[in-house]
Design a protein with these regions (language model features):
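Glycine-rich, charged/polar anion/phosphate-binding loops
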Residues: 16-18, 80, 147
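Non-catalytic connector elements of ABC transporters
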Residues: 1-31
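Flexible, gly/pro- and Lys/Arg-enriched active-site loops
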Residues: 82-90, 101-192
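Hydrophobic residues positioned within well-ordered beta-strands of beta-sheet architectures
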Residues: 11-13, 29-31, 40, 93, ...
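Nucleotide and nucleotide-moiety/phosphate-recognizing core
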Residues: 34-44, 48-123, 139
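Residue-level signal for beta-strand positions within conserved beta-sheet cores that form or flank
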Residues: 9, 66-69, 130, 157
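Short coil/turn motifs at beta-sheet boundaries
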Residues: 6, 24-26, 35, 86-88, ...
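A general secondary-structure junction signal
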Residues: 15, 74-77, 134
Length: 192
């Protein structure tokens, strides 16, 4: 239903079966499901080969997915590598996506896109053709083994906050309540 009606943001469907053949005295049995569009912010980065082409590839691949649409794209910025590994500079940016995927499904999708771009996970914080991180997903707070939302390190990384403030400066961090712009301003003041 949501795919057929792009202006609809949420739908709830309930199917009832009267006089269902169950061994209990019930008038009806029903199943209810709710689906909605979610807004997620993703960080993009590349420091190998044609960096901008890899970032564009990620955006194109996300738009090819029938359950995901890229709605905003930040400017791309060149940044020094993070994490102490000697390597080339990164090109970083952020995007806003509207998605019907759950956080786990979205993670699976972006991991597949990274793999299609030739990403190899050999060195922690090492060079990569394409890196895609889920930064924010609605106002969700999630702390699982392979998925942390909001992204654990996002408040410490200017290469995330700067492009994110370009497209979502007034979006609030779900844990500390500060806007992305406030987090970036704090980082700038601390560097002075």
């Amino acid at each position: 239903i949501l795919l057929s009606y792009p202006t609809m943001s949420e739908v709830e469907v309930e199917v009832e079966k009267p006089w269902a053949p169950v061994l209990m005295p019930l008038q009806t049995v029903s199943v209810k499901i709710r689906r909605k569009r979610h807004i997620a912010y993703l960080g993009l980065g590349s420091n190998m080969g044609d960096r901008e082409s890899y970032l564009d590839f990620a955006i194109d691949e996300l738009n090819k997915d029938e359950y995901t649409k890229v709605t905003k794209v930040s400017d791309f910025i060149e940044t020094e590598p993070y994490g102490g590994v000697e390597q080339d500079n990164f090109l970083n940016g952020c995007i806003e996506v509207e998605t019907l995927h759950s956080p786990d499904e979205l993670l699976h999708l972006i991991n597949a896109i990274e793999k299609d771009a030739g990403r190899e996970r050999l060195i922690h914080w090492g060079p990569r053709t394409l890196d895609i991180d889920i930064l924010l997903y609605d106002d969700l707070v999630c702390d699982e083994e392979n998925l942390h939302i909001p992204h654990i390190e996002m408040c410490k990384r200017e290469f995330v906050l700067e492009p994110l403030s370009n497209i979502a400066g007034y979006k609030r961090h779900p844990l500390n309540g500060k806007t992305i712009r406030e987090l970036l301003d704090e980082m700038d003041r601390n560097e002075e």
